[in-house]
Amino acid sequence: MSPKVIAICLVALLLPISISHGGRIGPIEPSKASSKVVERGNYDGRVEGCEEDDCLVERLLVAHLDYIYTQGKHN
């Protein structure tokens, strides 16, 4: 076989392996995991000690989850 065919076969074999390895999500380190828990009904939209972007993300996440979990009550 020519070197070009061998190289193409090698790339074709290694590419799926590298793609699947790159897509894996490893365990989250406990120091990086957020331990904030928002009780339903007790959230007033403010998060202490966060920057503007972090607060926006937090509020959007809570609003989205509230929207998801209240859909069954309206149908």
Curated annotation (Swiss-Prot):
InterPro entries: Phytosulfokine (IPR009438). It holds the Pfam family PSK. Residues 23-66, 72-75 form a propeptide. Keywords: Developmental protein, Differentiation, Growth factor, Secreted, Signal, Sulfation. One of its GO terms (molecular function) is growth factor activity. Sulfation is important for activity and for the binding to a putative membrane receptor. The modification Sulfotyrosine is found at Y67, Y69. One of its GO terms (cellular component) is extracellular region. Residues 1-22 form the signal peptide. It is found in: Secreted. GO terms for biological process: cell differentiation; cell population proliferation. Promotes plant cell differentiation, organogenesis and somatic embryogenesis as well as cell proliferation. Belongs to the phytosulfokine family. This is Phytosulfokines 3. It comes from Oryza sativa subsp. japonica.
